[in-house]
Amino acid sequence: MEITLKSGEVSAKITSKGAELKSLKVGNRELMWSADPAFWGKTSPLLFPMIGTLKDGKTLINGSEYKITKHGFARDLELTPEDFSSTSAMFSLTQSDYTKAMFPFDFRFTVRYTLKADGLTVTYRVHNNSNSDMPFCIGAHPAFATPGDMTDYRLEFPKLETAAVPNYNLSTGLHEENNRRPLIDGDTVLLLSHEMFYQDVCYFDKLRSRSVQLLNKENVGVRVDFPDFTSLGVWQAKDAPFLCIEPWCGSADFDDCSGVFAEKRGVEILPPDGEKAFTYTITAIELKAKV
């Protein structure tokens, strides 16, 4: 099932499978990647209750071993559309025998999409219906179209950033804590290239900013604000004409992790009957040329 939202010149399309955002238009501009399977057949999958991969493909939850699929199961399941209008739609997911075989908790997970004047607000909400603490990771994976030469694009942060990102080992699927590469040093601007992503994701686990702009040389692009998230992944498929800007709480395992899910870096933990919301926004921007 696909739902279309529209308000003035802003429109969005969301499919019930994974509650995935498939299109976001502001005026005549399509902000999202087209999901061309020649590069990557997705547009904006949900990451819950897992981000990335597990060390040795398994984890310990309450002393028992579990295997959770890469990026979690939410992106692959049908979510139930509910409480929707012409400008807002909410989708929900609760536990099942399938999810409990990977993640032994009762929960309610919702995602709400709400149009705004120049883009979209996305809010994830997680409720723990279990009688014990529930650890989980949560993240977004929106892919933005980057037509033309990738070297014409840059990321701009509102705060000065110094970041050496952990190497992502393509063989193990793990971040390497003691093998980092510097990407930005006391600056607000990061120039982009395809080669930057040949080792997969650039994971900013010590970022000061909670907002980032993706701009081309004409200063046209998008801004992603992510006040409720603790880190940021930036990724593209090899030589692809898109860039994913991914607000995260959690990540793929590091090579020095304990293997206990509740001890994962960036993990969130909800007490019984606890609830927490995570919001990010996508805003279309066209900046005036710098003088």
Residue ranges, per PLM feature:
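Extended, loop-rich substrate-binding clefts of extracytoplasmic carbohydrate-active enzymes
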Residues: I68-A117
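Asparagine-centered strand-capping/turn motif at beta-strand->loop junctions
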Residues: I14, Y124-S130, Q236
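Acidic-aromatic substrate-binding/catalytic surfaces of carbohydrate-active enzymes
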Residues: S11-E65
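Short Pro-Gly-centered flexible turn/kink motifs
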Residues: I14, T59-K67, E268-I285
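Active-site/ligand-binding surface loops and adjacent short beta/alpha elements
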Residues: D133, A143-T146, M150-F226
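Acidic/His-leaning functional-site neighborhoods
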Residues: V10, V26, Y66, H71-D83, ...
